[in-house]
C-alpha cells in the first residue's frame, strides 16, 4: 500500500505592512478613543510647567507621547522596556501618542521613564485628573443644554424646561452661587513597595555583604591591600540559622550577636582605611556606594540599640538598605498587620481620586482634615457640602471644625445612641452613608488590584510617589472614558424617547463599550 505524502496545512502568513498612515484606524478602538477624547492641550500645559527649561536646554518630547506612554504602562501593568516595545508593535497605541504614521522604532529610550517620574509628582497628576473632571462636567452641561433646546421645540415646553433645569443643577452646582457643593470622601491606605520581607538577620547579613563590597572597591580604586572580612565564615553561620525550619529564639539571638560583632569589625576596618590613609579616600567611591555605607552604619546603630534593650521597635526604623526611605506602616488588617511602603491620604470627588498626602513615615490620618478641605476648595472654588470618612476622622476636634465650616457630617455622632437613632429612617440614612463611603474603599482595591498601586517598583522616594500617583491617574482616565460611554447611552435613550429611529443613530459608537469597560 502506497503511503500518502504528508503536506502541512499551516502556511506562513505574509504581513502586508505597506500602510503607514494611522488616519484610517477604526474609531471604536479604546486607544483611538483615548487619543480623541483626552484634553491634551491642558495636559501638555501642566507637563511643560514642570520642566523649567524655558530659557535653555534641549527640546523635550511631546507631552502627549510622555503621558500616553505612562497610561499604557500602568493600564497594561508593563515594565519600562516592555511598554516601549508594546508601543512599537501597536499602531493603535501610536495613534493615541499623536503619531501620524506607524513606525517600528522606539518612541523614546526606556530610561526616560525614570526622569519623568523625577519631574512629575502627585501634584501634577492631581492637576491632570482635575482637568478631566472639569471636562466631564463641561460636557454634561453642554449635553443638558442641547437637550433643553431640543425639548423647547416640542409642544410640552414647560415639562422639558423643568427636566433640563434639574439636570443642569445636578451637573453644574457652582452656578447656584452657594459656597458648599458636592460630597468629599476621604480615607488613607498604604502603597506597598516591592521589597523582601525584612528580618533582623537578613538586614545584618546584607550590611555585612555591602561593607565587604565597599571595602573591595575602595582597595581596587586606590590600590590598597585587601583586608580579610571573613565573608564566607559569616555567610556560613547565617545560613545555618536561616535554613532551619523552626528557629529557636536562642539561636536567633546568638546569630544576631555574632553578626553585630562581625559587622562592627568590618565597619571599623573600613573607617580605619578611609581615615588613616587619606581624608579623600571616601570620596573616591561612587555616591551610591557612599550612601549605602551610611545607611548600613545607621542600620547597625538601630539594631545594636534594639538588641541591647531587648525591644523590636525604634524611631525611623530602616527595613531595607537599598530603600532606606521605606518605613513599617502598622495597619491592623487581617491580611497583614504591618505593611511596608508609603502611606497615602486620598480623596474622591465624583469618582475621581486625588492623592492629597503621601508620606513614607507613619502618621495619623485624622490630622489631614484641613489638608483635604483646602485642596478641595483650591480645585473647585467652594467647600464640600458633605464630608464622609472613617471613625478616625470623626473625632471631637474635626467635628468642631466641620460644624464651624457648616459642612454636613456623614456618620454616627459621638456618645451613646439617642432615641432618635433607633428609628428606621435614621438607620436607613446611616446605611446610605456607609454605602457612599465604601466607594473610596473600592477605589483602593481597584488601584491595587488592577493598576498595581500596591507594588511600587521605583526605588527612590520621589519616583515612588510619582509611581503611585500615576497608577491612580490611569484609573481616573478610565473613569473619564466610562463617563463618555454613559453619555452615549444617555443620548440613545433621549433619542428613543423623542421618537428617533434607532437605525439613524450612530450605533457604531456604542461598540466601544466593551473596550472602555476593560
Label each region the model flagged.
Residues 333-379:
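Electropositive, glycine- and tryptophan-enriched low-complexity nucleic-acid-binding patches
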Residues 28-71, 422:
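Basic, short loop/linker segments at the boundary and entry of helix-turn-helix/winged-helix-like folds
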Residues 1-40, 154-165, 486-518:
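Charged, often Cys/His-bearing segments associated with DNA-binding zinc-finger transcription factors
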Residues 290-295, 300-310, 428-518:
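Basic, amphipathic alpha-helical segments enriched in Lys/Arg and hydrophobic/aromatic residues
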Residues 57-61, 91, 388-396, 415-416:
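Acidic, metal-coordinating catalytic cores used for nucleic-acid/nucleotide bond scission
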Residues 100, 104-323:
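Active-site- or DNA-interface-adjacent structural scaffold in DNA-acting proteins
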